[in-house]
Amino acid sequence: MSTVDKEELVQKAKLAEQSERYDDMAQAMKSVTETGVELSNEERNLLSVAYKNVVGARRSSWRVISSIEQKTEASARKQQLAREYRERVEKELREICYEVLGLLDKYLIPKASNPESKVFYLKMKGDYYRYLAEVATGDARNTVVDDSQTAYQDAFDISKGKMQPTHPIRLGLALNFSVFYYEILNSPDKACQLAKQAFDDAIAELDTLNEDSYKDSTLIMQLLRDNLTLWTSDTQGDEAEPQEGGDN
């Protein structure tokens, strides 16, 4: 693929984003990734935004359908229809996740030439295995939970050694890893400890905040604090959803 073709694909991805056609955006950035050339920061973010929206729509649908399916007053037929529809959405969600994980393992992680990119992609790997864990059961769930935790931990270890505590990618990783502990592993203490440590470490080094990423970093710090408030409150309702990181 020529440089011109690649630039056209990136331009198409931007047009798709502006028109909120995220499936088109994801396919354009998938093609860019499959050239095998390391992505620029802009391209990396376009890929992440595209798939986050594509998978996010299915995650949201899955939650709604699951709650309808669990309503005891629904007739057996209604519950059956809801189950069949949920399974269809699950199939779509799994296909998207494995598509992303394939790109990460084949192209993105091996080509990552700096710690920032490596952490970004390992975090992404943790995220997409976490999305699989949300809908999996039994042994299949155990496998994807382990894969998610391994990817997050690898990213976490690199980020602690190579990145400032105020770096938005390191903060976003801590945010999502803590959500993994809270929601997937049912470990609120570990989730709070991780989120609090990340927040405190960033506060202690606020003077290292990069002007370019100031907004991103402070936003994620706010999300960490919001989750800590949510997780430590006794009056937490069942409907409350923890905040997840963006695409830094």
UniProtKB/Swiss-Prot annotation:
Keywords: Cytoplasm, Developmental protein, Differentiation, Endosome, Neurogenesis. The keyword Thylakoid does not apply. The keyword Cytoplasm applies. It holds the Pfam family 14-3-3. Changing R59A: Abolishes homodimerization but not regulatory function on Slo. It comes from the Eukaryota. One of its GO terms (biological process) is R8 cell fate commitment. It is found in: Cytoplasm; Early endosome. Its main location: cytoplasm. GO terms for cellular component: cytoplasm; cytosol; early endosome; germline ring canal; mitochondrion; nuclear membrane; nucleus; plasma membrane. Predominantly expressed in the ventral nerve cord of the embryo, and in the neural tissues of the head. Also found in the region posterior to the morphogenetic furrow of the eye imaginal disk where cells differentiate as photoreceptors. One of its GO terms (molecular function) is protein homodimerization activity. Homodimer; homodimerization is not essential for modulating the activity of Slo. Interacts with phosphorylated Slob; the interaction with Slob mediates an indirect interaction with Slo. Interacts with phosphorylated yki. Interacts with hemo; this represses 14-3-3zeta activity which prevents the 14-3-3zeta-mediated activation of phosphoinositide 3-kinase Pi3K68D. Required in Raf-dependent cell proliferation and photoreceptor differentiation during eye development. Acts upstream of Raf and downstream of Ras, and is essential for viability. Acts as a negative regulator of the slo calcium channel via its interaction with slo-binding protein slob. Inhibits yki activity by restricting its nuclear localization. Binds to and promotes the activity of phosphoinositide 3-kinase Pi3K68D which converts phosphatidylinositol to phosphatidylinositol-3-phosphate and promotes maturation of early endosomes. Belongs to the 14-3-3 family. This is 14-3-3 protein zeta. It comes from Drosophila melanogaster. The lineage of its organism: Eukaryota, Metazoa, Ecdysozoa, Arthropoda, Hexapoda.
